[in-house]
Amino acid sequence: MKVLHFGTLVASQGGPAMSTYWALYGLRQQGVDAEIIMFPLREGDVLRGEEVPVHYVQSVPHTPLAYASSCKRDIQNAGVFDIYHAQGVWLWSTYALVDVAKKLGKPYLITPRGMLYPQDIAKHNKGFKKLSLKWRLLDDLNHAACVHVTCKDEMMHCRNLGITSPMAIIPNPVEIKDYPYKKEDNKFRLGYLGRLSLRKNVEALIYAFADMGEMAADAELLIIGGGDDKYEQFLKDKVLELGLKNVVFAGFLNGEEKDKALASCSVLAMPSEFENLGNVILEGLVRRIPCIATTGAPWEELNTEHCGWQVPYTQKDITDAVRKAMCTSTEELSLMGENGRRLMERKYSVEAVAKDLKVVYQWILGKGEKPEFVYEGKKSDVNAKTAFVKELHQGKLFV
């Protein structure tokens, strides 16, 4: 079985690169000839790993569609595959991959990567997204052999848009291995790992430290990541404005540097308004670090598996969670960390996720039964599609 993904393996892209790499790596370990095509590397770009065959588009992408003139030709030149799998929406690369698959009479999948959440649709470029849906995206999604989502919430949002294709709920994978670095001090250190952008709500952690005053005086907030320069400056200005001396900006870290920084953390936090999964939680729990997330992400298991805290998306609740974590004994944090590691081994390993993807591919090719985690569209979904398309053409959406 040959499968071609279009996505990215550039390490600085964070979660999407990590999850795509390990999914493809795992598929190859399962005997699937899984490859990827991606845009050309820019100066300073580093690949997430070297164990997956990579093809490159020859032309540079341009906004807002990330249009690249040679995209279709380069996909065709990569060879003929049994299945084509696009990562993300709103991108020319997805349309190009779908066009090639249709031309060759091959099935294709689309992974929205959280881009079809209502909050993500509404945050910017609403007119462009409305045009994209009306022009062809909704049609492409509804002709996909399967849409891959990471949780039930993401599936619900897709159904609400009128997407009637079968949907496979498969989480992102994380590499299960022993990490050589251990925490070397007794300081409570709250870590954030990921892209710095407005919707990540990193300022909530800064406000939490400010609200706790003397209680947090001996603790530290470690912010690991880069991205939006203006947003990063906003965060740094807030730290100065609030007079905090215990907030550290580490910038983007990779490899050994990232492992050492994460090992120094007592707890990791993901205060985002919404996430379709959130790889920072995977990165923390696999390292036996308890985590904090909001109910905007599908991490009920932090509470049910006693490996962290999932709280409502309010400043008060986020601050209370940080306070609880800070007041938790080292022994209890260690127990929570072990619980998290066992959860990762059981459900989120590269092997487990790759097996599920392979089963979906086999089902699409008529070589297996429909997996229990694949959900067919219902009549109500068709009705939702009809209503959505009507509103879309009447211009009532994204006002």
Regions found by a protein language model. Name each.
Residues 1-43, 48-50, 373-399:
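N-terminal subdomain of nucleotide-sugar transferases
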Residues 4, 148, 174, 182-209, ...:
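Conserved donor-binding/catalytic core segment of Leloir-type glycosyltransferases
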Residues 103, 129-146:
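Membrane-proximal helix-turn-helix segments that form the acceptor-binding/catalytic region
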Residues 233-253:
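Nucleotide-activated donor-binding/catalytic signature segment of Leloir-type glycosyltransferases, i.e.
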Residues 290-294:
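Short hydrophobic beta-strand element within catalytic cores of glycosyltransferases
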Residues 309-316, 325-330:
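Conserved acidic donor-binding segment of nucleotide-sugar-dependent glycosyltransferases
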